[in-house]
Each structure stands twice: as C-alpha cells, then as structure tokens.
C-alpha cells in the first residue's frame, strides 16, 4: 500500500532508496569516464548555471548527471562542450616543454585544470593539476602550461573548471 504524498516526481510510494531526479536541472556536470570521478554517484564535478560564467562562445546546457563518453550529452543538439568549448591547444603537448593554450572565458573568473599525463584514469597523479585558480579575463586568454616530463604519448583526458570560486577540485560541487 502506497501511503506517501504524491508529487511531480513521486508516485506516492515510500521507497527508502529511490533517487531524486530533478528533470528541471540547472546544473552542468563534467564529461569523462567515471574513473575520473564524473558521475554524481562518484561526487563528480558540477556547478550551478549562473548565466554568466562559462568557457567558450556558447553557454553550457543543464545535465541530469555526468557523461562518461565524448559528446554523450548532446541529444538536444547543443554542442556546448566540444566545438565551442573555449579551450584551444595551440602548440603540441610534448613532455618537458611548455605548451600554449588559448582559453576563451565569458567573464572574469578562476580556472583550474588537470591533465592525466600518466593515463591511469585519474587526475590525482603528480603534476596533473596544470592550472590552479588562474585568473582569467573575459575574452581570449593566452596561457602556457608545462607538460610533465614523464607524460605518456597518446590519447588522454583533461578537465577544465572555470568558476567565480577558488579552490575547486577535479571532483565535487
């Protein structure tokens, strides 16, 4: 017998472990395999959309959770993370050298970024945080990052977080 109150997201049944799903999410999540702590269940990176703060030319769309494959959240046809993501690697990433990155910011704010140099599926390795609370101006910003001397050759993942707050981690809200 169901005797709980019904709502727009609840049929009235009392389920102790029922997830709360906000179909009107105003939150943007990160995109990467979950070994990088991407999903909400893994305390994945997320921020509330403020209509002011983002990287690139297009404001991000809201997500219900993190996405673990490239472009997997683009079912609505808004390419906010990829083509207009605001991050351009101008020079090659070569171990032990500096690499130029152009970051386009919608407003002033703080950038923190990680690159999985050792390709172990996490961002917690030595020297994997490449920017920490780097203050960006609105528009294009030319930055240089040092590629770790022990960086492995091949495809890897990166996470860039831009916020009005400092001290952000590669995971968490």
For each feature predicted by the language model, list its residue ranges:
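A broad "non-catalytic interaction surface" signal
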Residues: 22-173
């Amino acid at each position: 017998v169901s005797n709980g109150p019904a709502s727009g997201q609840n049929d009235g049944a009392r389920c102790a472990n029922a997830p709360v799903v906000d179909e009107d999410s105003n939150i943007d999540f990160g995109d990467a395999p979950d070994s990088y702590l991407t999903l909400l269940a893994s305390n994945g990176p997320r921020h509330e959309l403020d209509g002011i703060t983002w990287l690139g030319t297009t404001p991000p769309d809201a997500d219900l959770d993190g996405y673990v494959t490239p472009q997997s959240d683009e079912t609505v046809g808004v390419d906010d993370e990829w083509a207009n993501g605001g991050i351009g690697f101008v020079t090659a990433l070569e171990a032990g050298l500096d690499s130029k990155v152009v970051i386009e910011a919608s407003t002033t704010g703080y950038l923190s970024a990680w690159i999985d140099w050792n390709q172990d599926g996490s961002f917690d390795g030595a020297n994997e945080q490449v920017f920490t609370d780097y203050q960006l101006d609105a528009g294009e910003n030319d930055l240089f990052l040092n590629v770790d001397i022990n960086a492995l050759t091949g495809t890897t993942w990166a996470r860039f977080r831009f916020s009005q707050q400092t001290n952000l981690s590669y995971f968490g809200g």
